Amino acid sequence: MLKPVVTAILGLLLMGSSGALPAGCDRGERVQLLLEAKRRDASGQAMDKAREVIERRLGAAGASDVTVVRQGPNRILATFGGARDTGPIKALIGRSARLDFWLVDTSVAPGQAAAGEAPPGSRLLAVPGDGPDGRIAVRGRPIVNGTMIVDAQQSFDMSGQPTVTLRFDPPGTRRFARATSANVGRPFAIALDDAVLSAPNINEPILGGEAMISGDFTVESARELAIALRSGALPFDFVVVEERVVKR
């Protein structure tokens, strides 16, 4: 029941609150979004990082004339052109998009996980496609995470289904190779913002530093996830508190 989860999570990540630009918006106008961090105690360093990530995401998504500046202790003002529908853009720049690869704790039975039981050293992650009690237990710390991704692209698997292909940096490649070599035949979980996308078995050691995320993607949803991943994770989520159209 894990594959449908991809669509559900990407719906949250990419579609968010939809909103076409107000009537009369033309090429002489730009969109302004005022974003507020969901954490009131956000540090200046974290806000600087968030500003850079949002700027990269907007550029990678094809927005033009992008300007992203901090406003006060926990707000960011993003101004850009080239978008007729701001719904996907707002969701893309608002969510963390933190990707982690975990080893699954197979000692925890499904019933135990559903009841919220996990042994010391393990934790439970949500599996939205399995209902409100859908959970899976994972061990220790992530094998690799999104900070080790140097590239992410929309691609296709052998059956022609859209996927996202990832490439890790050298430390991530070594860690992924060690973990998969030591755990052939066991499952690992791929989680986006602590929600499990899929939990495939490790059929053989993965030594080349590449991985593929498959599921119920469309070409567009796979492309947007790839943009979010290669642009880097936000340190926390943001919410749009104001949207307006301004003259260039």
Regions from the language model: what does each represent?
Residues R27-E29, L34-I202, I206-L207, A211, ...:
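Non-transmembrane, solvent-exposed regions of membrane trafficking/translocation machinery
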Residues R244-R248:
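Conserved structured catalytic cores and adjacent interaction surfaces
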Residues L12-M15:
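Hydrophobic alpha-helical segments of integral membrane proteins
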Residues S17-A20, C25:
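N-terminal Sec signal peptide cleavage junction
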Residues F217, S221-A226:
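Catalytic P-loop NTP-binding/switch module of NTPases
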